[in-house]
């Protein structure tokens, strides 16, 4: 802004200058009593009102009425003060009716000045202003600095410069109003971009009247004042006019009295120019601030929309992951249920086989017992011919006992066959009940036939004992009944002194308990005790036999001495035979116990190997399942990551399209505004062109008239002041004048400093606010990015922890199942002795079949994986080609540099995150493969089926994705063709505009406008050419980036293919090593089995030899 100085700076020193300052500055002076007058002092208040106008191009109307008529001058002055505030002072209420005389009345005795002051003081007392064309008042608030006046610069061309003068009534009000109106109209046209309608001339004549221009300008100024503009205090400068002047005495006006001087036109124009310049600066700054605010709001809205989309995408991804987890859980449950049903069916089949085997073994044992029993019957018949008892009774008794025992054994076998999976306790209870029932039946029979049993001979008892020793004892299922019921028949049959067939059968049944490792010595000791007790009983019976024969059997024939000697010799030989038989029996028991121990060890070894094989198979299945799930999870994660990248690309392309559309809209808008401004500029030039000369003429005329009037007025006033001034008032007046000068200077300096400080503060505040908003936006953006990274990291760690927890839970559950299975197998181990041969044969057959099947499946899996690898490579190539095309089409649309930099940053971040994830996944896969190298041997069958199904599904998905990508490619090509058509249309439109501009340049007659238009067209052409060059550079850069990305992707594909080939080779090698290990274990088992069979055959041959030797003796 221009520098300001006080209008009183050029006042000459002296009393005249002081008097002029007193009459022009509008200061309130409260005068006391005159020294030589009896009238009281009057209060006096004057106001200076400056109208707001713009002097960009000096404007005024023709001087129509410059006469001296007071009514017309007052009316013009009222019109000129249409936008001026008339402020009433706060101390007017203190003025009384006695102080109503104007202070100028001391110097001017005519009624002219009083009449003019009265006409000015008749204005509204409620601080109102009037419009130009109507008399409706408008209320304005009173500013705090109502007494302050704005200083104005004086032109440098003027030699003589007077003090500041008040606005007189004869100042050409129309000229000032017209200039202000035209200046404001030009300002509104040139600098107000909010108005869209250009000014159009009237239909009567091509130039609008000044009154209409003044009215429009005043309305605009009023709206600016109501909206709180900063120029309000600069446009309205007024002092309060006391209402006490209405009661001042009036004297008749002398026609020859001179009028007061006016404010010069140059000062008013400079002041108007300063005010309008300040208003233009403030409006421009406000528009820039509003535009930046709107741009920031749009950026924030876009960021919020993108964040909302990202949240929705995350929610959808979470839903998809949950559905996939549910599906995987359902599949796991179905697989577990199938495995459980398969195990149950296998157990049932095994139990049925064992029951059949036990029945067959039982039948074979019965047949052997029957076969051994018949020779005993024949020998007994031959040897008991000399006994007095009848053989029919003995035969009947033996048959009865045999029938009972056989029936009991049949019951036991039936129970075993019916419930093979029952508990050992239930079997032991059934066997105990059968034994107790058989014992009770034997007791009844023994009570009935005790007399017949006592008459048996020693030879018959010896033969029964030999037959019992020759028979192989059968084992019971429970050893608990051993201590309770095994030797109960000895205690219960205290009356019988010899072994009967019933006792022998009962002893055979009770001695069928299995030989325990810790109870073998007890079993042999019990048998030895039973044999020794039997021999003692035989000796007692031999000693008691002669007495019983001689006394009790009167029907027998008395033996001779020779027969007695023979009998004694036979008894001695029998004692020797029994001793040797006891020794042999003990040795046989020891051998049998060793054979049983070896058989149990062999069975346990076989069961252990079978169990190990099953456990390894389960573990391999489990590890294969885990590997499959992990691979599927990683593949799914990579697919989701790729989908996310595609979605990000789509979002970025949409944003680019939106930005392009906005740029087009802004371009169209500004082209319209440029056209409107050109039309307005033409209209202004049409309006103001012929007025410039008139304004210059009016300026010259005004300056001449003003000089003459000012000189006359100064001379008259100096004369009046010299004549009327009282010497006693001069010192007081001088003091007041100096005091008011100082106050005015201070107020002006303070006001200027406050205005400058306010402008600086406002500018600094808004700059600071914009910087703070920009910094806050950057900070929020960085915080949001960091927060998103932290959330992604936490989500990844949480997912990893969940997967590890699930893996640990599955591992614990499987360990628990394995332990339960081991316990169950240990419980069922006692029932699996009869299945060793079948299991061996089945194991050999299954191992051979499994080896062949594994070889075939390995060949198939290798072929299938090679085929799948080729298909995947082909699909990846097609997908990469499609993505390359879509990427090129998307990146051709990007025109702004900040979008490109942002996209590169996002690409780098995403690439780093993807590389980190890929590295982590590769490391995790390597660790998992290293851990699972020794556990993937028997997983080929189910694996190939599932892999085949999975890859068929993947092929379907790939075909579907290929179709969708082809559709997207077609759509993008259509969009590209549309954009090319749009570009052609815009080029044609540009050519049309250039043609129109050239036509307009030919039509227009003014060289200045034609040059401006040509320069504008050249600027537009240059801008368009620069934009085309930028687009070409952008396209080249995009092509380079696409080629680099293609090369990187090709390298990555090659690396992935190499890794897959290495993994396949490693899997193939591991499978081969697993098969070789399996074959080695099978060969070792086969050799061990053959050695065990040979040992068993050898032991059986030894037992057979010993049995033959015993029978031969």
Curated annotation (Swiss-Prot):
Main function: Cilium-specific protein required for the regulation of cilium/flagellum formation. Involved in centriole duplication. May play a role in melanosome trafficking.
Subcellular localization: Chromosome, Centromere; Cytoplasm, Cytoskeleton, Microtubule organizing center, Centrosome, Centriolar satellite; Cytoplasm, Cytoskeleton, Cilium basal body; Cytoplasmic vesicle, Secretory vesicle, Acrosome
Biased composition (Basic residues): 374-384
Name assigned to this protein: Centrosomal protein of 131 kDa
Domain of life of the source: Eukaryota
Keyword annotations of the record: Cell projection, Centromere, Chromosome, Cilium biogenesis/degradation, Coiled coil, Cytoplasm, Cytoplasmic vesicle, Cytoskeleton, Differentiation, Transport
Residue ranges of domain IQ in the record: 276-296
Biased composition (Basic and acidic residues): 307-331
InterPro entries: CEP131 (IPR030465)
Coiled-coil residue windows: 259-371, 580-1111
Region (Disordered): 78-97, 232-267, 306-331, 368-401, 438-458
Primary location group: nucleus
Entry similarity comment: Belongs to the CEP131 family.
Keyword Transferase on entry: no
Composition-biased stretches (Polar residues): 79-97
BP-aspect Gene Ontology terms: cell differentiation; cilium assembly; epithelial cilium movement involved in determination of left/right asymmetry; intraciliary retrograde transport; intraciliary transport involved in cilium assembly; Kupffer's vesicle development; melanosome transport; negative regulation of intracellular protein transport
Gene name in the database record: cep131
Cytoplasm found in the keyword field: yes
Phenotype of null mutants: Morpholino knockdown of the protein leads to truncated cilia formation and impaired intraflagellar transport processes.
Sequence ranges of Low complexity compositional bias: 238-257, 446-458
Cellular component, GO annotation: acrosomal vesicle; centriolar satellite; chromosome, centromeric region; cilium; extracellular region
């Amino acid at each position: 802004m221009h520098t300001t100085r006080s209008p009183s700076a050029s006042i000459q020193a002296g009393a005249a200058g002081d008097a002029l300052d007193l009459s022009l500055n509008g200061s309130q002076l409260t005068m006391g009593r005159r020294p030589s007058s009896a009238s009281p002092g009057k209060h006096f208040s004057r106001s200076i009102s400056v109208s707001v106008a713009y002097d960009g191009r000096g404007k005024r109307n023709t001087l129509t009425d410059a006469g001296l008529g007071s009514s017309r001058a007052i009316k013009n002055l009222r019109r000129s003060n249409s936008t001026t505030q008339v402020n009433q002072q706060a101390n007017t209420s203190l003025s009384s009716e006695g102080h109503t005389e104007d202070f100028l009345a001391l110097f001017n005795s005519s009624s002219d000045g009083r009449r003019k002051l009265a006409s000015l003081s008749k204005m509204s007392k409620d601080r109102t202003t009037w419009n130009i064309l109507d008399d409706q008042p408008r209320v304005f608030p009173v500013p705090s600095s109502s007494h302050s006046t704005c200083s104005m610069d004086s032109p440098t061309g003027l030699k003589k410069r007077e003090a500041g003068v008040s606005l007189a009534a004869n100042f050409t009000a129309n000229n000032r109003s017209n200039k202000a109106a035209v200046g404001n109209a030009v300002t509104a046209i040139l600098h107000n971009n909010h108005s869209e309608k250009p000014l159009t001339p009237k239909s009567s004549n091509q130039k609008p009247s000044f009154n209409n221009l003044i009215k429009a300008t005043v309305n605009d100024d009023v709206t600016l004042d109501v909206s709180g503009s900063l120029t309000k205090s600069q446009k309205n400068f007024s002092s309060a006019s006391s209402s006490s002047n209405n009661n001042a005495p009036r004297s008749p006006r002398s026609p020859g009295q001179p009028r007061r001087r006016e404010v010069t036109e140059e000062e008013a124009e400079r002041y108007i120019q300063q005010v309008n310049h300040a208003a233009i600066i403030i409006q421009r700054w406000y528009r820039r601030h509003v535009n930046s605010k709107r741009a920031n709001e749009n950026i924030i809205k876009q960021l919020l929309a993108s964040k909302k989309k990202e949240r929705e995408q995350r929610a959808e991804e979470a839903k998809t992951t949950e559905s996939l987890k549910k599906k995987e859980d359902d599949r796991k449950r179905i697989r577990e249920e199938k495995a459980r049903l398969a195990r149950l069916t296998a157990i049932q089949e095994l139990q049925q086989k064992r029951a059949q085997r036990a029945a067959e073994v039982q039948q074979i044992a019965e047949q052997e017992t029957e076969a051994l029993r018949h020779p005993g019957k024949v020998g007994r018949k031959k040897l008991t011919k000399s006994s007095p008892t009848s053989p029919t009774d003995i035969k009947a008794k033996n048959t009865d006992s045999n029938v009972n025992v056989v029936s009991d054994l049949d019951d036991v076998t039936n129970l075993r066959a019916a419930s093979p999976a029952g508990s050992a306790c239930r079997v032991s209870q059934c066997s105990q009940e059968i034994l107790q029932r058989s014992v009770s039946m034997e007791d009844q029979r023994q009570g009935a036939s005790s007399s017949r049993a006592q008459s048996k001979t020693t030879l018959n008892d010896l033969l029964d004992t030999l037959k019992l020793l020759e028979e192989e004892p059968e084992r019971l299922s429970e050893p608990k009944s051993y201590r309770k019921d095994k030797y109960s028949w000895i205690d219960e049959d205290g009356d019988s002194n010899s072994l009967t067939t019933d006792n022998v059968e009962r002893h055979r049944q009770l001695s069928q308990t299995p030989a325990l490792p810790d109870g073998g010595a007890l079993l042999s000791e019990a048998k030895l005790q039973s044999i020794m007790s039997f021999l003692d009983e035989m000796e007692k019976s031999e000693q008691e036999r002669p007495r019983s024969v001689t006394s009790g059997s009167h029907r027998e024939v008395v033996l001779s001495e020779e027969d007695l000697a023979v009998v004694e010799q036979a008894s001695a030989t029998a004692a020797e035979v029994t001793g040797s038989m006891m020794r042999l029996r003990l040795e046989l028991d020891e051998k049998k116990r060793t054979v049983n121990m070896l058989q149990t060890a062999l069975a346990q070894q076989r069961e252990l190997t079978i169990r190990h094989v099953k456990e390894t198979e389960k573990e391999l299945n489990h590890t294969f399942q885990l590997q499959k799930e992990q691979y599927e999870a990683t593949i799914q994660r990579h697919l989701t990551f790729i989908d996310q990248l595609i979605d990000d690309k789509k979002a970025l392309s949409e944003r680019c399209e939106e930005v392009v559309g906005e740029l087009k809209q802004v371009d169209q808008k500004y082209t319209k505004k440029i056209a409107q401004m050109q039309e307005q500029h033409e209209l202004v030039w049409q309006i103001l062109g012929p007025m410039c000369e008139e304004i210059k003429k009016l300026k010259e005329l005004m300056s001449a008239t003003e000089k003459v009037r000012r000189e006359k007025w100064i001379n008259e006033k100096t004369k009046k002041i010299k004549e009327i001034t009282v010497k006693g008032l001069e010192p007081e007046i001088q003091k007041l004048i100096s005091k008011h000068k100082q106050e005015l200077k201070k107020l002006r300096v303070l006001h200027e400093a406050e205005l400058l400080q306010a402008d600086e503060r406002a500018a600094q505040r808004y700059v600071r606010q914009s910087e703070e908003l920009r910094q806050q936006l950057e900070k929020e953006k960085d915080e949001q990015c960091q927060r998103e990274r932290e959330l992604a990291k936490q989500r990844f760690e949480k997912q990893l922890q969940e997967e590890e927890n699930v893996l640990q839970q599955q591992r614990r559950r499987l360990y628990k199942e394995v332990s339960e299975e081991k316990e169950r197998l240990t419980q069922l181990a006692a029932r699996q002795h009869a299945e060793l041969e079948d299991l061996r044969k089945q194991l050999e057959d299954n191992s051979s079949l499994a080896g062949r099947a594994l070889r075939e499946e390995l060949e198939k899996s290798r072929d299938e994986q090679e085929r799948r690898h080729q298909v995947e490579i082909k699909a990846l190539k097609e997908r990469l080609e499609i993505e390359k095309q879509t990427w090129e089409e998307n990146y051709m649309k990007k025109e702004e540099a900040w979008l490109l930099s942002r996209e590169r940053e996002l690409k780098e971040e995403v690439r780093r995150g993807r590389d980190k994830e890929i590295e982590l996944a590769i490391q995790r896969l390597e660790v998992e493969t290293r851990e699972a190298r020794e556990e993937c041997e028997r997983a080929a069958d189910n694996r190939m089926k599932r892999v085949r199904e999975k890859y068929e599904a993947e092929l379907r998905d790939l075909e579907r994705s290929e179709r969708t990508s082809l559709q997207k490619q077609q759509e993008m090509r259509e969009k590209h063709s549309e954009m090319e058509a749009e570009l052609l249309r815009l080029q044609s439109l540009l050519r049309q505009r250039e043609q129109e501009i050239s036509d307009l340049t030919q039509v227009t007659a003014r060289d200045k406008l034609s040059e401006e238009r040509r320069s504008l067209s050249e600027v537009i052409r240059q801008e368009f050419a620069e934009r085309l060059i930028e687009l070409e550079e952008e396209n080249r850069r995009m092509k380079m980036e696409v080629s680099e990305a293609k090369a990187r992707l090709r390298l990555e594909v090659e690396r992935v293919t190499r890794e897959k080939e290495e993994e396949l080779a490693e899997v193939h090698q591991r499978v081969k090593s697993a098969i070789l290990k399996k074959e080695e274990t099978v060969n070792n088992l086969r050799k061990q089995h053959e050695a065990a069979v040979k040992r068993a055959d050898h032991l059986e041959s030894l037992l057979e030899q010993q049995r033959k030797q015993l029978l031969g003796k």
